[in-house]
């Protein structure tokens, strides 16, 4: 799909990742895409240095809305659901994040009209997302 990983290309993603890293907040990318595709995208966008873990749904055998990918990332990083914030732009991803027990921020983009009502909060950009992350 040509829209896969589009959120990584959004304005202010790099700045947000820098700030999270400066504050010792772990960043994992959990995608329904293949892990290799996610890694290639991160490399292309020069974001790999910010990321603690990459999880591909097609590689682990569980795709969103199954929460497995988020639960596995939490387990691997020794983080509980109440310490986890998921930023998602898809309906399936939001459902997975909610089912994992994480706090879910829905990112509203111009490409997709996803059903985002299950998220804890909906933001229009990553500057807004940052405010919720650091207020939680």
Descriptions of predicted regions:
Residues 1-29, 35, 39:
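Short, acidic loop-to-helix structural element flanking the phosphoryl-transfer center
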Residues 18-21, 35-136:
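Asp-based, Mg2+/Mn2+-dependent phosphohydrolase catalytic module
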């Amino acid at each position: 799909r040509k829209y896969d990983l589009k959120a990584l290309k959004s304005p202010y993603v790099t700045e947000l990742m820098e700030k999270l890293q400066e504050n010792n907040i772990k960043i994992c990318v959990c995608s329904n895409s293949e892990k290799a595709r996610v890694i290639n995208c991160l490399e292309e966008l020069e974001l790999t240095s910010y990321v603690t873990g990459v999880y591909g749904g097609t590689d682990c055998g569980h795709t969103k809305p199954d929460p497995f990918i988020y639960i596995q990332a939490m387990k691997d990083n020794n983080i509980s659901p109440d310490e986890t914030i998921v930023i998602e732009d898809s309906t399936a991803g939001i459902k997975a994040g909610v089912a994992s027990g994480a706090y879910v921020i829905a990112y509203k983009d111009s490409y997709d009209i996803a059903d985002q009502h299950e998220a804890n909060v909906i933001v229009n950009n990553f500057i807004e997302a940052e405010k919720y992350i650091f207020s939680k």
